[in-house]
Amino acid sequence: VAEVISMPDTAAAFARPYVVSWNLTYRCNLACEHCYLDAGPNKVKLPAFSDRSELSTEQCYRVIDEIAAFAPECVTILTGGEPLLRRDILEIIRYGVAKGLWVVVGTNGVKITETLAQLLQTESVRGLALSLDALDAERHDSFRRVKGAWENTVEGAKILTRVGLPFIVQTTVGAHNRHELAALAAFAHDELGAKVWNLYFLVPSGRGSYVSDLSPAEYDQVLGELAGIQRQWASRMLVNAKCAPHFVRTLLSEESPAPFPKSFTGGAGGCPAGTHYLGIRPNGDVTPCPYLPLFAGNLGDAGLREIWDTSDLFTRIRQRDHLGGRCAPCELKSLCGGCRARAYGMTGDVMAEDPLCTHQPGTLQSAVDTLKPADVGAVEYGQPAAAALRWEPEAKERMQRIPAFVRGMVTRAVESWCEKNGVAVVTATALEEIRAQMPTPKVFGTRDSR
């Protein structure tokens, strides 16, 4: 159950996205120096080179219809800019939830109040993602370029905890905070109540093109530290590296076990751009990754499924056999693939090697050779696994809280555990016992202590 399983490297693996990150607006109440969207106060329209405005409420409804038809129950992150600045944000959330999407709100947390948190809970938002980049207000506010941002975000997180809405804390690592990463993780969990701590590795895009201040060797050191933090918080808080698919190399290199799968089915692991993930810009432009300023089409001109299935950009970015530089011969390319947005931002070639990676191909071949096929194979997105055991109603209901793209695999894994342990009927108690043995906690999908 604890294994994370990558999809097979076949056309079926790319049938639908698991996650859609949708930038609803360029407007923002902060002016973060690393913003990939170059968002900020008073930005209503796109930059001067475009005559397209942000999508209207009705246009957003049509986009939601397309997402729901193409990728039922997919995780849909409504972000910005600051999405809570849109006057119609609750209407957009309500419509998305009604269509069966797993709606998550990506926000800086500054605008969260008790009233708003309760409204978001009423609208059945699955969770929120908040940004926090330092333990002290001065450094965070300097990075976010608005005085008082830290205090408001921290208070917003505490409000969410009181209301009972789960949330993620997002931190972008840099010279300003790399010395306090372990303390930031502890603060996110112990002081704020976060279910997840995501550490982002900067991608040179938007304003972020100008603020990278860590060398590849320093990033390697951070990844090593992050592996230790991940082990420290196992079973209490999920700890992830974001925009760092080569984290797999760090984990495979370690002699001591980390909460990462030492088995796989091969295929599209690592960077999910264009394989499991896509981004939508405020004007409807579609990209394989929000950090990648290359666009495969616009939803005003073509349907989402058509863009996903037929665009040259999506087709190209999936072809890991066509990667360049050190990524081409790398034994980890099916597990990693490098960050395509970083490759483009630093070289101008979306298929180039990831300049942040220091790995020399071939040096981990022996570790890769020891990997075995996963015990629980992939199940096509959204398809239920055929139940071999009887499930109690409460256990069935809980499974519906698990995202559709892994529900079939989790069902198989649960039944496999039950069969090995002589359990004939899947009960809520059995699920609790299984969950207690997992290296990472449950995150979204429940609002009570069960």
Task: Walk through the language-model features, giving the residues of each.
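Radical SAM enzyme [4Fe-4S]-AdoMet core and its adjacent flexible, acidic
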Residues: 1, 23, 46-50, 55, ...
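Conserved alpha-helical substructure of the radical SAM core
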Residues: 2-123, 127
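Flexible mid-to-C-terminal extensions adjoining Fe-S/redox cofactors in radical SAM and related proteins
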Residues: 3-16, 291-383
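Cys/His-rich metal-chelating microdomains
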Residues: 27, 31, 35-38, 274, ...
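Aromatic/hydrophobic pocket-lining residues that form π-stacking "cages" and hydrophobic walls in ligand
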Residues: 63, 92, 96, 156, ...
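Non-catalytic accessory segments flanking P-loop/AAA+ NTPase cores
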Residues: 381-450
